[in-house]
Amino acid sequence: MITNLFIKSFTFSRSLKNFYVLSLLNYFKLKIYNKIYVPTLGVSLKRKRRSYSLNVRKMEITYLSQDLSQKIDNELMSDEVGYTTEQLMELAGLSISQIIFKEYKPCEFKKILICCGPGNNGGDGLVAARHLKQFGYNVVVLYPKVNDKTLFKRLLKLLEHYEINVLMSLRASDLDNYDLIIDSIFGFSFKGEPRKPFDEIIQMINNSNKVVVSVDVPSGINIDSGLSTNSLFINSDMNISLMLPKQGLKNYKKKHYLGGRFIPISIIKKYNLKVPCFSDDNPYVML
């Protein structure tokens, strides 16, 4: 009889523990759906608050014109605000590399070609190259038109220390060696149409059938309209906007991220900007 009593007691104890575990799991599961429940020892769970329906609102976000993009960018680097070009490039380049890592793992996209232009958009690409190298990718940079400013010389010097090859030219057949191409040629300052050597590079990229990711905007498009004066622009598979997306990307139908997360509260208030909510310490958000 003592043995039977022990077995029944043990069975009840195990059942009670299992019930607590299941109740705890249900608590967290239901909390995810904005319903707060308190696990009890009763048959059912006792509701503590009203539940709310999962109506997902469309993300509110400001799309910047070319003029406003330039104005905000200049203000960010003014003495009044305090950013430097180097700081903004580092923040942008890091978020670019983190988004690339999220979407294109190095086990599948081992070798990356980053095509950089002579301006700040190209500088973002040079920074991203360094981080992607640390993330385990085999990175090569195409930099056909070198910027002579000290900042860009220092970025190139860093690439040497990370053993990243920098090319000055490229043949169409060379693109077969890469799994992913990053378009960091032209940013929001671009006007007109692509000129040599970038017109040929854009054509080669579009003809390569490789996965292409554009930084800020697909190179060659009009920042405000999203069109191209001569139909020569990067046909990218994904775009990573910086600061805020540009007006020309309102109808962008492919995967679209926002990276950077560096607009101060004062600028947001001054220009009445609608900035999406970033998750905790995440420097990017999918649009």
From Swiss-Prot:
Domain of life: Eukaryota
GO (cellular component) term, any one: mitochondrion
Gene3D superfamilies associated with the record: YjeF N-terminal domain
YjeF N-terminal domain residues: 69-275
The EC number(s) this enzyme carries: 5.1.99.6
PROSITE patterns: YJEF_N
Name the UniProt record assigns to this protein: NAD(P)H-hydrate epimerase
UniProt source species: Plasmodium falciparum (isolate 3D7)
